[in-house]
Amino acid sequence: MNAHAQACAVTSSSPDGVLRERGQREVFCGLTGIVWLHRKIQDAFFLVVGSRTCAHLIQSAAGVMIFAEPRFATAIMEERDLAGLVDANDELDRIVAQLLARRPDIKLLFLVGSCPSEVIKLDLSRAALRLSQRFSPGVRVLNYSGSGIETTFTQGEDACLAALVPVLPSADRNARPSLLVVGALADVVEDQFKRTFAALGIDNVAFLPPRRSSELPAIGPETRVLLAQPFLGDTARALEERGCRRISAPFPLGGEGTALWLAAAADAFGVSRAHVERTLAPLKARAEKALARYRAQLAGKRVFLFPDSQIEIPLARFLAREIGMELVEVGTPYLHRDHLAAELPMLPAGTLLSEGQDVERQLDRCREARPDLVVCGLGLANPLEAEGLTTKWSIELIFTPIQGFEQAGDLAELFARPLLRQTRLAV
């Protein structure tokens, strides 16, 4: 398999200087998004239609919620399902009926496709429509794909939120302008942003996904969309098709990124720059103070970012500009130029960007560079550690609350911690 992938690998440099690679990949699938989404939407349930491997992945990654039943499960496809010996739709209907009878608290059910369900062409969109009609109005059933075929793991959230867009209510014709923050955020971060938006004078603010399915925000031409994550391409497109307008901004990582993100929203709502600066100044100062101790530890250290989560470019901007790290290479699975238009000019001149993945070639470049820190997926971390390189799991940067002023120090600490561990082990 490695030999075949290597033979088919393509590496090219585009006129814009981005190294584009198409070869062997090393990624988690979109099912991983359930780990944080099932905690966010409190009356939703995620039913994966997949194999035992899918079940092991979700169970291992998410664990079991203490003192509560988990809000995810797997309808396991057996060999007879794959062989077409039974009607998979009948089996799915039976499982959903059992689930909803046992869990009356479920108000929103996601049928999540996987590699096996896509291979046998199981039409989960028709199943979702059929089941939604059957269990309406108490339960709404939607579907999306968490398959790992030609995707990366954060696309699971994008697919989930894109599935919600068609069922968002339409705002009234005379609705006043509203702000929709898109992307799953920890509740504590969401609450911080709500307070800051209110202090800026923006009070008509909603978040997608909401904490409960009954709180789906109304959208329309007067809705301004502010992305909290850079990997929400399908969701942004679906919102724009419904008349929403996206605000271009850097992403809220670090003090600088958060300030620019909030300022872009304020500008779209006509808030004066003087008021924005007065409001944000003490918050920026607090973030600066938190970052100072980590800057002393990390400044001048060299970092290599493998393509994995799609947040690599905002992370690189934060590490270079606010922490003083040197960027050896910044890889990203997909380079969405429109969504990253405010980020790309903020990277240091001459930064090596790579889009896509050819893991063997990237490993060769990483080994040759011998950076102080490697940000990569779990599958690469242990082998690189065995070779004497210090690593940081990129997936941890998705699980952990890192957005906003108050979390700037926590974000920096995530990069300082593995280097500190390495120092202690060397003593």
Curated annotation (Swiss-Prot):
State where [4Fe-4S] cluster binds: 29, 54, 115
Reading the lineage from the top rank, the first entry is: Bacteria
Q: In which pathway does it act?
A: Porphyrin-containing compound metabolism; bacteriochlorophyll biosynthesis (light-independent)
Q: What cofactors does the UniProt entry give for this protein? A: [4Fe-4S] cluster
Name the UniProt key words of this record, in alphabetical order. Answer: 4Fe-4S, ATP-binding, Bacteriochlorophyll biosynthesis, Chlorophyll biosynthesis, Iron, Iron-sulfur, Metal-binding, Nucleotide-binding, Oxidoreductase, Photosynthesis
Give the signal peptide, or none: none
What is known about what this protein does?
Component of the dark-operative protochlorophyllide reductase (DPOR) that uses Mg-ATP and reduced ferredoxin to reduce ring D of protochlorophyllide (Pchlide) to form chlorophyllide a (Chlide). This reaction is light-independent. The NB-protein (BchN-BchB) is the catalytic component of the complex.
Q: What is the designated name of this protein?
A: Light-independent protochlorophyllide reductase subunit N
Gene behind the chain: bchN
